[in-house]
């Protein structure tokens, strides 16, 4: 079996070469990303392996099928960069990473919150230049504040437990609430509008769909308290409207 890798980084080559020693798959690596312009690089392959920045839209999938590709393997959990309908029509199987460590993503979300609140990213550059002034770097104690979590799946549940350890009140919103988990964790489900209104920190942990894309828009930000922090590991805020709120001293997003 011959597999073409697109968007390859050095760590991809190192990891897959090590694992492939037990399987003997013929692998060819390309640093360039898959798209309609460089799809000929997949000529002669049985499968292609792609990542989040590759594009397997309908025209690209059609060309892959014409060249005999029968499998698209994603090195990620998300699959919004693949036209699944086109793949099905051409008889191409699509597989993906079923899940990441929920603790790793939850801990990263906390790192984003702390960086946004305490301006760690700005302080880093200042101290490199020997500037230890605190002006513009002050945040607030997370202990005693309110966190709003949108979506309460595996990652969010790990995050909620961490934030409860910080001594925070945690509000949650989910179309399918799990009241048993809420009681066990000390989290309270509330309507989304109330979550926006009451939260000091908001973290989004919901699938990227047409409904959730840019869900932190002007209307949502307008409901938040001034100074609310919003952390999104999944890129949901509308940066245009968030920028306007930043300039008026309101919510900040990372």
Question: Which positions does each model-derived feature cover?
Answer:
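An N-terminal-biased, well-structured beta-alpha scaffold segment characteristic
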Residues: 2-93, 217
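Rossmann-like dinucleotide-binding domain for NAD(H)/NADP(H)
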Residues: 213, 218, 222, 226-254
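Rossmann-like dinucleotide/phosphate-binding beta-alpha-beta segment
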Residues: 135-226
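A short helix->loop->beta-strand "cap" motif at the edges of active sites that frequently abuts
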Residues: 66-71, 90-92, 168, 226-229, ...
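Short gly/ser/thr-rich secondary-structure transition/capping motifs
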Residues: 28-34, 52-53, 126-135, 183-189, ...
């Amino acid at each position: 079996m011959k597999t073409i890798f697109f968007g390859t980084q050095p760590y991809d080559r190192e990891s897959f070469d090590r694992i492939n020693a037990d399987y003997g798959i013929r692998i060819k690596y390309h640093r360039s990303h898959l798209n309609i312009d460089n799809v000929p690089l997949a000529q002669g392959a049985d499968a292609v392996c792609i990542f989040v920045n590759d594009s397997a839209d309908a025209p690209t999938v059609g060309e892959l099928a014409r060249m005999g590709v029968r499998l698209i393997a994603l090195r990620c959990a998300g699959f919004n960069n693949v036209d699944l309908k086109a793949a099905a029509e051409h008889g191409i199987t699509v597989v993906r990473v079923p899940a990441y460590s929920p603790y790793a993503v939850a801990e990263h979300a906390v790192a984003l919150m702390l960086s946004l609140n305490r301006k760690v990213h700005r302080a880093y550059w200042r101290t490199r230049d020997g500037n230890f002034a605190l002006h513009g770097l002050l945040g607030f104690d997370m202990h005693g504040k309110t966190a709003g979590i949108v979506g309460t799946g595996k990652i969010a549940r790990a995050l909620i437990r961490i934030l409860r350890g910080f001594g925070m009140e945690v509000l949650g919103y989910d179309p399918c609430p799990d009241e048993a988990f809420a009681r066990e964790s000390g989290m309270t489900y509330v309507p989304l509008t109330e979550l926006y209104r009451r939260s000091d920190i908001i973290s989004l942990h919901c699938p990227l769909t047409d409904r959730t894309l840019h869900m932190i828009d002007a209307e949502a930000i307008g409901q938040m308290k001034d100074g609310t922090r919003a952390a999104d590991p999944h890129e949901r805020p509308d940066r245009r409207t968030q920028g306007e709120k930043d300039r008026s001293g309101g919510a900040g997003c990372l």
